Swiss-Prot record:
Lineage of origin: Bacteria, Pseudomonadati, Pseudomonadota, Betaproteobacteria, Rhodocyclales
Enzyme category, top tier: transferase
Matching InterPro entries: Dimethylallyltransferase (IPR039657), IPT (IPR018022), P-loop_NTPase (IPR027417)
Name used for this protein in its record: tRNA dimethylallyltransferase
GO molecular function, one term: tRNA dimethylallyltransferase activity
Length: 320
C-alpha cells in the first residue's frame, strides 16, 4: 500500500502553525517545514519560528538547519524532504508538510527542471546594470521579456530577478517553459493537500499588520543587530532578503526611519501573501483532490483535522 503525506499550505498569517499543532494532537504526525526562512538558525522572531514548547510537542524537521551565511535552495528542500518523508513513514508515522514557500511544494510535486548553471559573465553584466539602474528597473526589463515570471517576483528581490533574467537570456525561453522541461520521477507516496485561503483579504492584511507589530515589539530589530554581530552577513544574502529582515536592515543602515521601516515591512509581507495566493490559485487548477479551507473561519483547526482525516481515509480506501 502506498503511504500518504499530508500537505498544509497557506499564505503568511493564515494559521498554518496552529493548525499543524492541532493536527499533531490527534494524529501521529511529524512536521516537515516548507518554509525558506525557517531553515536559518538564530532567525526566530522575524520568521515566526515555532517556539521551543511547540517544537517539543511534535517533531519538527527542516527548522534551524543552516547558517544565515548559507543558501538553501528548492533542490536542497526536495532532496531533504524526500529523505525525511521516507524516514517518517519507516517510523510508522504520517509526514505533514506545512508552510508557505510554494516553490518548494511545486518542486516536491513536479520535480526540478534542468536549468542552466550560473553564468559568471552574464551575472556580472546583470549586477552592473542593477548598480546603475536599480533592481526595480531590471524587474521592469524582465516584465517585458517574460511578464509571467515578473508577476511572481517582488521588484526588489535581487536574487530571484537576477536568476530569472539569467535563465531567460541563456535559454531564450520564458521561465515557465524552462521549468516545464523537468524529469519528475513518480513519488513513492500520495500527496494529500489542504490549502488555507482567506475569504476576506482585508482581514488577512490586518492580521499581517498586527503580526509585524508583534515581531517589532518582541525584539526583531535587536535580533538582526545580534545576527549582524555574530555572522558575516550582507544585504544580498538569501537570509537577509527575507521579508522583515530586509526592511530592518535598511533601517539599521540609516536608510529609513522607524515608521518607514514598519510601513515597508507590512507592505512587503502583504505582497508576499499576494504572491503565495497566486501560487495557490494555480495549484487549485492543477492539483486534483486539493481541499481549500477558509483560514478565517473560527473553527479552522477542527476543519483542518476533519479534512485531514477524510483525505487519509479516502487514500487508504483507494489503495485497496
Amino acid at each position: 500500500m502506498q503511504p500518504s503525506a499530508l500537505l498544509l499550505l497557506g499564505p503568511t498569517a493564515s494559521g498554518k502553525t496552529a493548525s499543524a499543532l492541532a493536527l499533531a494532537r490527534v494524529l501521529p504526525i511529524e512536521i516537515v517545514s516548507v518554509d525558506s526562512a525557517l531553515v536559518y538558525r538564530d532567525m526566530d522572531i522575524g520568521t515566526a519560528k515555532p517556539t521551543a514548547a511547540e517544537r517539543a510537542a511534535c517533531p519538527h524537521h527542516l527548522v534551524d538547519i543552516v547558517s544565515p551565511e548559507e543558501s538553501y535552495s528548492a533542490a536542497h528542500f526536495r532532496r531533504d524532504a524526500l529523505r525525511l518523508i521516507g524516514e517518517i513513514h519507516a517510523r510508522g508515522r504520517i509526514p505533514l508538510l506545512a508552510g508557505g514557500t510554494m516553490l518548494y511544494f511545486k518542486a516536491l510535486r513536479d520535480g526540478l527542471s534542468d536549468l542552466p548553471a550560473a553564468d559568471a559573465d552574464l551575472r556580472a553584466d546583470i549586477d552592473a546594470a542593477a548598480a546603475r539602474l536599480g533592481w526595480p528597473a531590471l524587474h521592469a526589463q524582465l516584465a517585458q521579456i517574460d511578464p509571467d515570471a515578473a508577476a511572481r517576483l517582488d521588484s526588489a528581490d535581487a536574487q530571484r530577478i537576477q536568476r530569472a533574467l539569467e535563465i531567460v537570456r541563456l535559454t531564450g525561453r520564458p521561465l515557465a517553459e524552462s521549468y516545464a522541461r523537468r524529469e519528475a520521477a513518480a513519488l513513492p507516496f500520495r500527496m494529500l493537500p489542504i490549502a488555507l485561503v482567506p475569504s476576506d483579504r482585508a482581514v488577512l492584511h490586518a492580521r499581517i499588520e498586527q503580526r509585524f507589530d508583534q515581531m517589532l515589539a518582541a525584539g526583531l530589530i535587536d535580533e538582526l543587530r545580534a545576527l549582524r554581530a555574530r555572522y558575516t552577513l550582507d544585504a544580498t544574502l538569501p537570509s537577509m532578503r527575507c521579508v522583515g529582515y530586509r526592511q530592518v536592515w535598511e533601517y539599521l543602515d540609516g536608510g529609513d526611519d522607524y515608521d518607514t521601516m514598519r510601513f515597508k515591512g507590512i507592505a512587503a509581507t502583504r505582497q508576499l501573501a499576494k504572491r503565495q495566493l497566486t501560487w495557490q490559485r494555480q495549484f487549485r487548477d492543477s492539483w486534483p483532490g486539493l481541499v481549500e479551507l477558509d483560514c478565517l473561519r473560527p473553527d479552522l483547526t477542527n476543519a483542518v483535522n476533519t479534512a485531514a482525516a477524510r483525505l487519509l481515509t479516502r487514500s487508504r480506501h483507494a489503495a485497496h
